[in-house]
Swiss-Prot record:
Family (UniProt): Belongs to the UppP family.
Protein name: Undecaprenyl-diphosphatase
Miscellaneous comment text of the record: Bacitracin is thought to be involved in the inhibition of peptidoglycan synthesis by sequestering undecaprenyl diphosphate, thereby reducing the pool of lipid carrier available.
Main localization (coarse): membrane
InterPro entries: UppP
EC number(s) recorded for this UniProt protein: 3.6.1.27
GO cellular component, one term: plasma membrane
Membrane topology category: Multi-pass membrane protein
Organismal lineage: Bacteria, Bacillati, Cyanobacteriota, Cyanophyceae, Synechococcales
Catalytic activity from the UniProt record: di-trans,octa-cis-undecaprenyl diphosphate + H2O = di-trans,octa-cis-undecaprenyl phosphate + phosphate + H(+)
Single GO MF annotation: undecaprenyl-diphosphatase activity
Superkingdom as given in the UniProt entry: Bacteria
Length: 287
């Protein structure tokens, strides 16, 4: 699918990618689906679907933000894993967290690369990326998050994470390849079902997303740049930069919010978002 920015001049392309970066930054780490909003917002603004490559490449800004925000945590994880390999200290919390991150990345890595190299064209044009599909998925995920909020024990903390926790949350992360699911939403929901405290669940979700989103962004970066040869890399850099700044703010806000509040705000938002999309599609999209 051709990138609509190919028909935009440099200023228009920079403005479009700036907006996409802001949308990406606001929605990547909140459990409301960045993919859905990056599909819907450009459609509403008349830009058309920017495509998988552009949206994946702009996610690199979010990854830069999460790496910078959690630089101390990541440094501790790397040191813990290093000690585990040298001295066999795999019971240390940092080593177990690193192992859980690796195990949790495998599902989305395998499935994501499979889609990229075996079903790329079909995925771009799949009904799964349609507005009604995104709306229905958003509503279903809202109901699952509501159930997790109700039944979750909210006792598990990040320092007791095990490989099985990483695999469970990692499988949920792989579901986010379906537009509308929300990587943050699916991982947060799975972690709540597994008995995690809200803020620790969000923290692990952010850390777990680093490898998978980084790989996806780098894989798609070449295609994203090739999609708009006339404007060069500047628009994409603007999008990545705005995504980084807004992502940092969103991470900081969400962690503080979940220390004091439940996820019901996001449940309500996703229900309303999904219902409004169905109404909009029924009025305008089905004709």
């Amino acid at each position: 699918m051709a990138d609509p920015s190919a028909s935009l001049n440099l200023v228009e392309a920079c403005w479009r990618d700036l907006v996409l970066g802001v949308v990406q930054g606001l929605t990547e780490f909140l459990p409301i689906s960045s993919t859905a909003h990056l599909k819907v917002v450009p459609e509403l603004l008349g830009w058309g679907d920017p495509g998988v490559s552009v949206t994946a490449a702009i996610q690199l800004g979010s990854i830069a933000a999460v790496i910078a925000y959690f630089r101390t945590d990541l440094s501790q994880v790397l040191r813990g894993v290093s000690r585990a390999f040298r001295y066999g200290q795999w019971r240390e919390p940092e080593a177990r967290l690193g192992f859980a991150m690796v195990v949790g990345t495998l599902p989305i890595l395998v499935i994501g690369l499979g889609i990229k190299f075996a079903w790329s064209q079909g995925y771009e044009q799949s009904p799964l990326r349609s507005i009604p599909s995104i709306a229905i998925v958003s509503i279903v995920m809202a109901l699952l998050l509501a159930l997790a909020e109700q039944v979750g024990a909210r006792s598990k903390q990040l320092d007791v994470v095990l490989g099985r926790d990483g695999l469970l949350v990692g499988l949920a992360q792989a579901l986010a390849l379906l537009p509308g699911v929300s990587r943050s939403g699916s991982t947060l929901t799975a972690a709540l079902f597994d008995g995690w405290q809200r803020a620790d669940a969000a923290r692990f979700s952010f850390l777990l997303g680093i490898p998978g989103i980084t790989i996806a962004g780098l894989v798609e970066l070449k295609d994203a740049l090739a999609a708009s040869p006339g404007n060069g890399p500047l628009p994409l850099l603007v999008g990545i930069g705005s995504a980084a700044v807004v992502s940092w703010l969103a991470i900081d806000w969400l962690l503080k919010f979940l220390q004091r509040n439940s996820t019901w705000l996001f449940v309500a938002y996703r229900l309303v978002f999904g219902l409004l999309l169905l109404v909009w599609w029924g009025v305008y999209g089905s004709h």
